[in-house]
Structures are given as C-alpha cells and as structure tokens.
Amino acid sequence: MAAPFALVSRVSPAARLPIRAAWRRARPTVGLPSSGRARQLAVASAAQENRDNTAVDVHVNQDGGNQQGNAVQRRPRRSSALDGISPFGLVDPMSPMRTMRQMLDTMDRIFDDVALGFPATPRRSLATGEVRMPWDVMEDDKEVRMRFDMPGLSREEVKVMVEDDALVIRGEHKKEEGEGAEGSGDGWWKERSVSSYDMRLALPDECDKSKVRAELKNGVLLVTVPKTEVERKVIDVQVQ
C-alpha cells in the first residue's frame, strides 16, 4: 500500500493541501495515561473524626473522615525528609544523651519538610520570628531538662511515668461539636476530634529515675530528671 504522501505527490499542488489536512484529521489519537492523575475514593461516614498521634521517635498518624456522599482525592506520594533515614544511625550506645539529641534533631528535619503536612507543625515566635520546635532537651552536670509543647491538654489529660529505663509521656484530648440531636433529620451534624500523644525516651543510666518531676503550664510540659553521681572504676593497664 502506498504511503499517503506518495499519493499526494501525483495530484496537482492546489489539491495537496485539502488531502493532507484530511489525512491528518483521520489519524488516530493515542492518549497516554497521566501519572499525576488522582484517583477518587468513595468515603462514607456520618461524622468527621481526626486523630493525631505524635511520638518522639515520631509516628504521626492522621485519619480523616468526611460526611457521607463526599469524595476525596488521593495524591501521589512525594519525597520527604523520611527518605533515607535509618533508625540504626540514630543510636549511639556509648552516649545515651547523644542518642536522644540525634533523635530530636532528626525530628526537626522532618518537621522542616512542609510536604509531609503534619498537623503539629513548628511554631514561629512573634517576637523574634524564629521557628520554635515542639520539643527540646537540655543537659548539665546535675540534671536533664526536657520541654514538650502540648497545646489544648489539661493536667488531668497528661500522664508521665517511668517504665524500666524509658520516660513515657501520654496524653489524650477529646472534643465534640455539633448542632441538633440525633435522628432529627438531614440537618443534624456532629464533629468529633481526638488528639493523642505517646512519647517515649530512653533515659541514661546516670539518671535518678525515682525523682523525675513534671509540670504542665500554659500548654507546655516541663520534665526534669536529676542525675546521680556515678563512681567510675579506673584500672591502670601496663603497657609492654
């Protein structure tokens, strides 16, 4: 079968343009699927519920629900600060305090990645304009001081304990808003949200775990862990 352009060359120049245009219109159009096209998922729920779980070794989960009949779009996964992070590279068996600092520094990197969209984002100070991270650890010769931002939680909703060699901080805040009463018709709606915190930090051996102090003030939890004097046994080794 002859090519289309070979047939066009045998006719007059005035007739070539309509024939060529008709051949172009007759060519089939092939559409490649778009990799960035979002898929729609049907979600059916009667109320909205948001749950935020924050941990120091940082597991932040958020489950969102919409009203019945709505559709949500699922976005493609983006690269983030979590890529390439190995938990084995954060542990220093020779220095527990260095391990704690490395974990918190890693969390600072994660919260700097705005693509993650975590609910608990760093706060910006109005006075200095600097970013305030939601936790901090300071250490001197006498004690270890830790700060955790827990906005919206009261003292009754926060529990601090020591399990074996780990400091555990847990909190849960429930909130419910809505209008009308259940069964009153389509106009009834109610919104429930639950925020929970589960933080766990390994304490150094030289800390006095029986004298841990905790204070919650204006949404900021301050934890103080005193240190004990550790007598180091030194043995001189003769060099031959």
UniProtKB/Swiss-Prot annotation:
- The ranges of region (Disordered) come to 59-84
Is Plastid one of the keywords?
Answer: yes
PROSITE patterns cross-referenced by the UniProt entry: SHSP
Q: Where in the cell is it found?
A: Plastid, Chloroplast
sHSP domain location, by residue? 126-240
What induces or represses expression of this protein, per its UniProt record?
Answer: By heat shock.
Identify the SUPFAM superfamilies for this entry: HSP20-like chaperones
Q: What does the similarity note say?
A: Belongs to the small heat shock protein (HSP20) family.
| PANTHER family for the chain | 26.5 KDA HEAT SHOCK PROTEIN, MITOCHONDRIAL, HEAT SHOCK PROTEIN 21, CHLOROPLASTIC
Protein name (database record): 26.7 kDa heat shock protein, chloroplastic
The organism encoding this protein is Oryza sativa subsp. japonica
